[in-house]
Amino acid sequence: DTPFECPSDWSTHRQYCYKFFQQKESWDDRSEYDAERFCSEQAKGGHLVSIESDEEADFVAQLVAPNIGKSKYYVWIGLRIENKKQQCSSKWSDYSSVSYENLVRGNVKKCFALEKKQGFRKWVNIDCVEGNPFVCKFIRPR
């Protein structure tokens, strides 16, 4: 009973597979140019990356930093603020709860990205329609 391996061009960390995509997409504008939708099409259970510990944050930063173009400053992650009847709830796009936080306090834009000047370790909220590279994540099937 061999454990499932991530596809050859994906990186493995614990029970997940990760891949950094250079192309610039919006977070989720319900169009064909949409990072969350793109991730969901890459693998069953695929989403924009959720980051649930310092260790995972380090792993994702190391995946992004050597591979990102010089002119690119933000990388989408799967966190978005959703307004529901005046109550804001932050949720990862894979529906995991936000128990680990690494925010740079900013404005009230709705979608979160890793920022280059923070070494791709801190989360900043920026406009969801901006085109940015992104990281996808899915759990390895058993």
From Swiss-Prot:
InterPro entries in the cross-refs: C-type_lectin-like, C-type_lectin-like/link_sf, C-type_lectin_CS, CTDL_fold, Snaclec
Record flagged with keyword Iron: no
Source organism, top-level taxon: Eukaryota
Keywords: Disulfide bond, Hemostasis impairing toxin, Platelet aggregation inhibiting toxin, Secreted, Toxin
Molecular function in Gene Ontology: toxin activity
Disulfide bonds: C6-C17, C39-C136, C111-C128
Occurrences of domain C-type lectin (ranges): 13-137
Family per record: Belongs to the snaclec family.
Its biological purpose: Binds to platelet GPIb (subunit alpha) (GP1BA) and functions as a receptor blocker for vWF binding to GPIb. The platelet GPIb-binding site resides on the GPIB-BP subunit beta and not on the alpha subunit. At a final concentration of 104 nM totally abolishes vWF-dependent shear-induced platelet aggregation (SIPA) at a high shear stress, but had no effect on SIPA at a low shear stress.
Comment field (misc): Negative results: does not induce platelet aggregation or serotonin release from platelets.
Name by which UniProt lists this protein: Snaclec GPIB-binding protein subunit alpha
Provenance organism: Bothrops jararaca (Jararaca)
